[in-house]
Amino acid sequence: MTQITVKALSEEIGTPVDRLLEQLADAGMNKAVADHVSEDEKQKLLAHLRKEHGDATGSEPTRLTLQRKTRSTLSVNAGGGKSKNVQVEVRKKRTYVKRSSVEDEATREAEEAAMRAAEEQAKREAEEAAQRAAEEKAKREAEEAAKREAEAKRMAEEKAKRETQAATQPRSDEEKLKQEAARKEAEALKRRQEEEARRKAEEESRRQLEKVRELAEKNGERWSADKETVGDMQENTDYHVTTSRYAREAEDEADLHEEGARRRSTKANKRKMSSRDDNQERDSRPRGGKAGRKGRINKPMSMQHGFDKTAVVAKADVVVGETIVVSELAQKMSVKATEVIKVMMKMGAMATINQVIDQETAQLVAEEMGHKVVLRKENELEEAILSDRDDKFEEVSRAPVVTIMGHVDHGKTSTLDYIRRTHVASGEAGGITQHIGAYHVETPNGMITFLDTPGHAAFTAMRARGAQATDIVVLVVAADDGVMPQTVEAIQHAKAAGVPLIVAVNKIDKDTANPDNVKTELSQYNVMPEEWGGDNMFVHISAKQGTNIDGLLEAILLQAEVLELKAVKQGMASGVVIESRLDKGRGPVATVLVQSGTLRKGDIVLCGQEYGRVRAMRDEVGNEVEEAGPSIPVEILGLSGVPAAGDEATVVRDERKAREVANYRAGKFREVKLARQQKSKLENMFSNMTAGDVAELNIVLKADVQGSVEAIADSLTKLSTDEVKVNIVGSGVGGITETDAVLAAASNAIVVGFNVRADASARRMIEAENIDLRYYSIIYQLIDEVKQAMSGMLSPEFKQEIIGLAEVRDVFKSPKLGAIAGCMVTEGVIKRNAPIRVLRDNVVIYEGELESLRRFKDDVAEVKNGYECGIGVKNYNDVRVGDQIEVFETIEIQRTID
C-alpha cells in the first residue's frame, strides 16, 4: 500500500499544509507534517470532505470498476526449427453500477401499474362483450315476437277477408249470425295472443334483469376478495424486478393479459353469442397462461353490465397565504402550472413557475379558474404576542413630545440649543443637523421632550417620522427669509399627522426682519394666527439672544394642557425607534422614545425585524439609567441587529416567541420585496427590453445612522434620469468594511461614506482594486458630486458652428480637380480641412468637404475675411457663380444633470 507524507499530499492536491492538517483533524486523524498517510486514510478524508460539502452519500460508491490482468506464455515458431516464448497479457475491465432503491421502487410501481391497467382493460372489454350479447338477444327476441304477431295478423286478415267474401252472398239470417260470431271470436283470439306475447316479454326481461343483478353481486364479492388476496401477496412477496427471472415473469404476465384481451375482442366480433349461460360459462373460465405459477391469481375476465359515473373535477377550497409560489398555487388547485401561467397572461401578468405572487393576484387567478379562495392570516403569532400585555393600569399625565421643524438655517437647532443651554449646533457638520436628536429638558413649569429634525429636502422621511411620534410641532420660520419649500413640507407633515402647530418667528433681532410678512405667507397655507381668528399661536423669538424663549415654552405647555396628554406609566413599555446605528464597540444602538409603560434594563424588546434583551440604557447625555417612563428618549443596547428607524418597539414576555416573530417579519419582508421586484406587466415588456441602453452609476453607501442611509439613498435614487440611473448596490450602517470593498469591486461601484471611515483591511482592498472612495460630512456636497459623476456619464451633445462664408465670383475648370470656384471670403475664415455646405439662393444643395484651397496658386491652410481664394469642392462640379460656400465645424457640448 502506497504511503506519502502529509507535506507531499498537500503539494499534490494543491492545498496549504495547515489547511490539510485541519481537515485531517476534523476527520479524526491527528497528523504531523512528516507523518505518512495511507490509502485508507485518504479515503476516510475524502468521505469526510464529501459529507461536509453536503454530499451525504458521497462515502458510498455507486459505481465499482474491477480490472483484471491475466498473463500467459505462448510458444511461437520463429523459423529454422526454433521457437520462442511470447508473454501475453489479457486485461479485463468490468464496471458494476449499484442501482438505487428509488429506481427499483419506481420500476416495480410502473410494472404494477401496467398489470392493473391490463386487468382493468380486460374487465372492461368483458363487460362490453356481455352487454353486446344481452342487447343482441333482446333484439332477436323482439324480432321473433314481431314476426309471430305479423303472422297472426296476416292469418286473421285472410280469415276476415274470406268471411267478408262469403258475407257478400248472404243466403239467410242464420248464416249472418254465424259470420258475426266467427268475426268476434277471431278478434278475441287476436287480443289474447297479443296479451300473452306482451306478458311473456315482460317476464323474460324481468328474469334477465334479476339474473344480471345476482351475477354482478356475486362477481363483485369475488373480485373484492381477489383484490385483497393479490394485495396481501404483493405485500408479502419481495419482487426483485432487477433480476432476470422475475423481470421475465412480469413481462410474460403482461403479454398474457394483452393477448387475452385481443383474443376476446376478436371472437366477439366474429360470431354472435346465442346463449347467456354459455356466455357466462365462457367468461368465468381463466384465459391462457400458466395457471399454476406462483403468485398468480386467476380472475374473471368480464361481467354482464358496467355502471359508469360521470367524472366531475373536485373544486376544493384553495388556502392562500400572503405570498405564494405559482407552482404551489397550481398544486393546490390540482392543475398544471402552465395552465396557471396561461390564465395570468390572459389577465395581463407575466410569471414563471417559481415566481412569488402576492395574495391578491393569487386570489384573482384562483377565482378565475373556478375555485373558492380562503385567505389565511399568517401573523396570528404576532398578534397574539403583541396582545399579551399587562397594560390595565391607570393613565397619568405625561410630558409633551415637541418636534422642532423648519427650513434649513432658520434656527431650529439654535432654538433648542438655547433651551437646553448647550452648544450642539456647533458640533454638527456645517451647522446642519444630520440626524434626529432626542432630548428631554426640565423647565420650571414641567418637563418637555424635544425632537430636532433636519430641515433640508433630503431628510423628508426623517421629518415625517418625527411628526408621527410627536404631540406638538414648533415651526421655526426666519423673519428675514419667510416661507421656504421645507417650511411648506413641515406644515403638510404636521397636518397629515393631526398635530397642533406653534409658529416660532425667529431672528426678529435682525434689521431685515418682517414678522407680519411671515404671517401673511403662512396664511396662504391655512396657518392662521390667533389674533386673526385662527388656531395657531405665533411667538416672536430670537434664538441668538434668547429673546422670548420663555414665552415659547409657556405656549408649548399651554397647548399640552389643552391636549390633556396621558399615558400608562406602569406595565410593559412600548415606543418608537427614533434613530438607530451600528456602534463599533457596542454593537447595534437604537434611540427609542417610550410612549407608554416603563422600559427597564433586562426587558425583552421586539423592534421590527430585530429583537433582544436590553443590556444597557443611556440617556441623551450618555448616563446609565435603569428605567425610562413615557416621553423619555433613551439609547438601548442588546438588539440582534440595527432596526429601521420608525419601527415600533414593544416589550414582550417570551424571547423565543420574539425571535419567531422577528424571523417571520424578515421572511415576509423578503418575500414581498421579491414579489414586487419580479412583477412584470405585458405593457412594460418593450420598456424593459430597451433598458440596456441606460448607463448605471453603482454606489455602495455607508452612513452613521439608519435615518441618514434612508434619506441619502432616496435623494440619490431621485437623481436618476432616462439616460443615467443611480443604482444603490449596497447600503448599511457603520464603518466601511472589506466586504463593502469587495462588493464595490465586483459591481464597479464607488464607495460613499457619510460620517464613517474605512478600516485598515478595507483601505488595503480599495487601494489594490483602485476603487473610488469618497468621504462626506455634509449631504449637499455628496449630492453635488454624484451629480457631477452622472454628468460625466451622459452622452455629449454636438453643435455645428459656422466659422466662415465665401461667395463664388467665377468658376474655372481644372483638368486635375474639376470645377474650381473663385471666391471672396465675406465672413469669418475659410479653413482647409473643415466641412462645407454649398448654398444656392440660401438653400443648401450640397454638403461635403474642401478638396483644395489656394491663394495665388499656393496651397494655404486658411483664408481670412476680405481675401480672394480658389476653392475646390470634393466630388462636386456643379458650382455656379453666385453660390455661397459655408464653412462650419462641430463643437462638443458637455451635458450636466440639473
From Swiss-Prot:
Stretch list, region G1: 406-413
Region annotation (G4) ranges: 506-509
This protein's record includes keyword Chaperone: no
Keyword Protein biosynthesis annotated: yes
Ranges where the record places region Disordered: 51-302
Principal subcellular localization: cytoplasm
Region called G2, residue ranges: 431-435
Protein name, per record: Translation initiation factor IF-2
